[in-house]
């Protein structure tokens, strides 16, 4: 291989201005070039997005990323700078095609916030081979990340039993992924995020007050740590009011709680404990706060929490949780492992037959059956336009998302949050268990 082409960006310049069309894999473009050359580029096709299986032991997943995809589609372009780069390995006809590229196809799929299971046809992308193949990496980048985060977040929401959770993982992931993670967590039921960009871009409520550094900043050389903590708390209360949250574990939690109430009075909004035996410390802090008259002061805990440690704290006097690393890494499942497979050409089903990686052919839609109580019982995948006759309660899952390249779906976060909440309520009792198990409901596919 020869040397790489010269980069246009100088070292030290920001790297977040890459043309959206370049957020892809090279082989999408080399396939396009070959298809344009042999005349197959304009053949009508359908690509399907699905997961062959859930992450090990998971019982359901939560679809997230739909809104971000619809937001990204109009920006998925190849500008002059991008085309200059691509001309180094693509023929002129392909570069001309990319210069004028606009996705003008249709997309159907599950609404954002919908639950999914193995084989669920989460997205169906229709258009010419040329325009559909170019979207593969963009679609999978968004859905594999956001769905992994939302699926982990939903498990944490269930484990918290109605207590609020705050997403605090920005410093544990890429700066752009942090914004998407905050959005996905909020969809799944988190109450807020520490990320201000997520607030500005998506309206996710932002929470945050102070770190240990602020307390240590007030230490005097050789002076007692207790005085430093008091000074820090007084400064924070004077700036933010008594309803603020004071971090009480920089030195000693018992002393920290006393200093917090002394600084803010009985109207202190909350204390946060970020280390140690959180359950034990929360009990001790609750008793101490009540003795000091701060009976309405809330207790927030944080520090390497995941769904399992959150569940273990359900019996403790904890009012809310701050979750970082485990959330933004998918709590052990950093990708949803979704794939983007060609399932139809010229209206005729096609399918991959490789061992362990089979993908049923044909464009598909889905519905979900349930009992009269609302508890879901089965996911039924059927050929598009040919739904089976079902007399028991059911709900259609496949909805129009894009028509002729234009978004047509409601992608509001409020609607997605409501869909997640109702979906979790509809699961069978075993479906919410954190212990490893089979998918909460079976998926049955009617062949084309």
UniProtKB/Swiss-Prot annotation:
Q: What is its EC number?
A: 6.3.4.21
GO BP terms in the entry = NAD biosynthetic process via the salvage pathway
Query: Which pathway?
Result: Cofactor biosynthesis; NAD(+) biosynthesis; nicotinate D-ribonucleotide from nicotinate: step 1/1
* Family matches, as Pfam families: NAPRTase, NAPRTase_N
Enzymatic class:
ligase
- Reply yes or no: does the keyword Protein transport apply: no
Point out residues bearing the modification Phosphohistidine. 212
Q: What InterPro entries does the database record attribute to this sequence?
A: Aldolase_TIM, N/Namide_PRibTrfase, NAPRTase_N, Nic_PRibTrfase-Fam, Nic_PRibTrfase_pncB, Nicotinate_pribotase-like_C
Q: Which reaction does it catalyse?
A: nicotinate + 5-phospho-alpha-D-ribose 1-diphosphate + ATP + H2O = nicotinate beta-D-ribonucleotide + ADP + phosphate + diphosphate
Can you tell which superkingdom this protein's organism belongs to? Bacteria
Classification via PANTHER family: NICOTINATE PHOSPHORIBOSYLTRANSFERASE, NICOTINATE PHOSPHORIBOSYLTRANSFERASE PNCB1
**NCBIfam families linked to this entry:** NAPRTase_put, PRK09243.1-5
Q: What does this protein do?
A: Involved in the Preiss-Handler pathway, which is a recycling route that permits the salvage of free nicotinamide (NM) and nicotinic acid (Na) involved in the NAD biosynthesis. Catalyzes the synthesis of beta-nicotinate D-ribonucleotide from nicotinate and 5-phospho-D-ribose 1-phosphate at the expense of ATP. It is not able to use nicotinamide. PncB1 contributes to basal NAD level.
User: Protein name, please?
Assistant: Nicotinate phosphoribosyltransferase pncB1
- The organism named in the record is Mycobacterium tuberculosis (strain CDC 1551 / Oshkosh)
């Amino acid at each position: 291989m020869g040397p790489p082409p010269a980069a246009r960006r100088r070292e030290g310049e920001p790297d977040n201005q890459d043309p959206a069309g370049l957020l892809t894999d090279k082989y999408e473009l080399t396939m396009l070039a070959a298809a344009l050359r042999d005349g197959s580029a304009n053949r009508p096709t359908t690509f399907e997005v699905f997961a062959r299986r859930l992450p090990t032991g998971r019982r359901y997943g939560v679809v997230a990323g739909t809104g971000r995809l619809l937001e990204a589609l109009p920006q998925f372009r190849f500008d002059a700078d991008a085309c200059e780069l691509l001309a180094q390995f693509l023929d002129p006809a392909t570069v001309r095609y990319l210069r004028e590229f606009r996705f003008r196809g249709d997309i159907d799929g599950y609404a954002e916030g919908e639950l999914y299971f193995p084989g669920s046809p989460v997205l169906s992308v229709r258009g010419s081979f040329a325009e559909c193949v170019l979207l593969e990496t963009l679609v999978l980048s968004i859905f594999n990340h956001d769905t992994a985060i939302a699926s982990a977040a939903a498990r944490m929401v269930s484990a918290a039993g109605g207590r609020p959770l705050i997403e605090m993982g920005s410093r544990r992931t890429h700066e752009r992924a942090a914004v998407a993670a905050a959005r996905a967590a909020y969809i799944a039921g988190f109450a807020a995020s520490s990320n201000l960009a997520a607030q500005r871009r998506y309206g996710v409520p932002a929470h945050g007050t102070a770190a240990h550094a602020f307390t240590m900043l007030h230490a005097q050389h050789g002076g007692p740590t207790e005085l430093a903590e008091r000074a820090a708390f007084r400064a924070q209360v004077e700036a933010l009011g008594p309803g603020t949250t004071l971090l009480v574990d920089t030195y000693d939690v018992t002393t920290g709680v006393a200093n917090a109430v002394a600084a803010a009075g009985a109207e202190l909004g909350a204390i946060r404990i970020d280390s140690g035996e959180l359950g034990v410390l929360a009990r001790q802090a609750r008793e101490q706060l009540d003795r000091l008259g701060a009976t309405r002061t809330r207790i927030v805990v944080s520090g390497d929490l995941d769904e399992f440690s959150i569940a273990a704290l359900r019996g403790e006097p904890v009012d809310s949780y701050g979750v970082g690393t485990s959330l933004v890494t998918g709590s052990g499942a950093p990708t949803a492992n979704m794939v983007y497979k060609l399932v139809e050409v010229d209206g005729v089903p096609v399918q991959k037959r490789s061992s362990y990686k089979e993908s049923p052919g044909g464009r598909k839609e889905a519905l979900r059956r349930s009992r009269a109580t609302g508890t879901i019982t089965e996911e039924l995948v059927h050929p598009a336009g040919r739904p089976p006759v079902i007399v028991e309660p059911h709900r259609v899952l496949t909805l129009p998302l894009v028509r002729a390249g234009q978004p047509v779906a409601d992608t509001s976060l409020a609607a997605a949050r409501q869909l997640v909440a109702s979906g979790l309520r509809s699961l069978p009792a075993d479906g919410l268990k954190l212990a490893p198990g089979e998918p909460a409901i079976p998926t049955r596919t009617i062949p084309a």
